[in-house]
């Protein structure tokens, strides 16, 4: 997997590392952005309870409200990933 570059986060290190591991596995198994997002969302819902939101893409803007400690925005290669819980 390409290097992870965190742009913004208020997530604890342990959960953040878990998000990176889930994303790595999803990106290894899928090439479509919506499929990568779906895998990450389902896994986060399963591990940490509902309701997680995941956006994966090369170019997008965002302005979201999230639970405290449940937000990370990062890049893996050319893909940006926004993962947060509401």
From Swiss-Prot:
Tagged with keyword Nucleus: yes
InterPro entries, alphabetized: DLC_sf, Dynein_light_1/2_CS, Dynein_light_chain_typ-1/2
Disulfide bonds: none
Subcellular location: Cytoplasm, Cytoskeleton; Nucleus, Nuclear pore complex
Keyword annotations of the record: Cytoplasm, Cytoskeleton, Dynein, Microtubule, Motor protein, mRNA transport, Nuclear pore complex, Nucleus, Protein transport, Translocation, Transport
GO BP term, example: protein transport
Entry keyword Nucleus: yes
Pfam families named in the record: Dynein_light
GO molecular function annotations of the record: dynein intermediate chain binding; plus-end-directed microtubule motor activity
Superkingdom in the source lineage: Eukaryota
Cellular component GO terms, alphabetical: cytoplasmic dynein complex; cytoplasmic microtubule; meiotic spindle pole body; nuclear periphery; nuclear pore; peroxisomal importomer complex
PROSITE patterns: DYNEIN_LIGHT_1
Function statement: Acts as one of several non-catalytic accessory components of the cytoplasmic dynein complex that are thought to be involved in linking dynein to cargos and to adapter proteins that regulate dynein function. Cytoplasmic dynein 1 acts as a motor for the intracellular retrograde motility of vesicles and organelles along microtubules. May play a role in changing or maintaining the spatial distribution of cytoskeletal structures. Also a component of the nuclear pore complex.
Record note on quaternary structure: Homodimer. Cytoplasmic dynein consists of two catalytic heavy chains (HCs) and a number of non-catalytic subunits which present intermediate chains (ICs), light intermediate chains (LICs) and light chains (LCs). Component of the nuclear pore complex (NPC). NPC constitutes the exclusive means of nucleocytoplasmic transport. NPCs allow the passive diffusion of ions and small molecules and the active, nuclear transport receptor-mediated bidirectional transport of macromolecules such as proteins, RNAs, ribonucleoparticles (RNPs), and ribosomal subunits across the nuclear envelope.
Family per similarity comment: Belongs to the dynein light chain family.
PANTHER family in the cross-refs: DYNEIN LIGHT CHAIN (PTHR11886:SF35)
Protein name: Dynein light chain 1, cytoplasmic
Taxonomic source organism: Candida glabrata (strain ATCC 2001 / BCRC 20586 / JCM 3761 / NBRC 0622 / NRRL Y-65 / CBS 138) (Yeast)
